[in-house]
Amino acid sequence: MTKLVALIVGLLATPVFAAATLVQTSDNGTPDHVQWIDYGTSTQSMTFGSNLTNGNSVICGAGAYHSDSGLEFTLPSDASTNTYTERADSGAQAYSRAYVWATHAITGGISSITLNMPGLTGGLYGQATCQEWSGLAASPNDTGCQATLAGTAGDDAEANCTTATLAQAEELVWCLSHMASDFDSNVNYTDPTTGTWTNVFRVQDAATNSAGSADRRTTSATTAVVVQYGHDDLPATTDRWSVACATFKVAATSTWHWRRRR
């Protein structure tokens, strides 16, 4: 009995975080993985190449231009009636708004998700994308940040935001930035300046008054994440920026190891 107790006491469980895995990205347009939100639409279908898998997570983001502050998306929906939550919203302003939504432990068997923009008084332009992920924690939603910026002509400031301290070291950070630019053919978006990011899509040409970028990274510390995009000087006072970011905890497994007894 004494030996058994000693054996149990001598074993310790240490949490080990396995990297979250990207399963697939919606792929509706050009460039890859971006769906253009057309002028005057109230819904937009986001289509995947394969059916979604039971138990996985889906993260969606959208950014759009609208001529007044009436631009507002409601929650996404799908045929499996999965429940989506709004993880980040840059907030209402004229010309630009960005969102991030997510749903977890999904009921799969579907290959499309609908983004909803009801009640608009006019048309809008924008971009959106959705990704399916596996390997997130059972309760993955952690923190996030959002911001807007109203520029002036020749201004190279950007919408930036900083998350709160993360709940754990290993988290997925997912951001979408949108820029309403005065028919600029290339806004020269760059990756966020802090950390190493993977781009999901990037639209540099704002010929329809709408440029955008979605980006993600995995953290290795609980330090707050600073998100700051770079771009060219704004060509007009009507230009606007918005950014929305959310963080998601990665699932942990336990690794047993021996502890030397003193």
Q: What feature does the model see in each segment?
A:
Residues 17-262:
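Primarily extracytoplasmic/secreted proteins
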Residues 1-20:
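Sec-dependent, cleavable N-terminal signal peptides
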